[in-house]
């Protein structure tokens, strides 16, 4: 089973200074090392600077990716598990008669 995580990042000033395509490739490698796949990566304005949508096997891999990315980049991440609305609909059907 694959789990989707939304990883919101906030850059420190040093993390922003060291941003580069090479660092992005290293970040992609960290996700892959823990059997994950990046579904999307977006720069943002506002309270968060970065959004990564990542598929990972489980919470242990999500924690390892979080720690690895933070160590590599200096970016502080807040991660949330997510499910599709289709999956939510299926779950709600299972509890419809409760």
Positions of predicted regions on the chain:
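Short, well-ordered beta-strand segments in beta-rich or mixed alpha/beta enzyme
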Residues: 5-10, 42-67
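An amphipathic, aromatic/His-enriched active-site/gating alpha helix that lines ligand/cofactor pockets
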Residues: 56-86
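Generic structural signal for residues in well-ordered beta-strands
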Residues: 38-41, 77-79
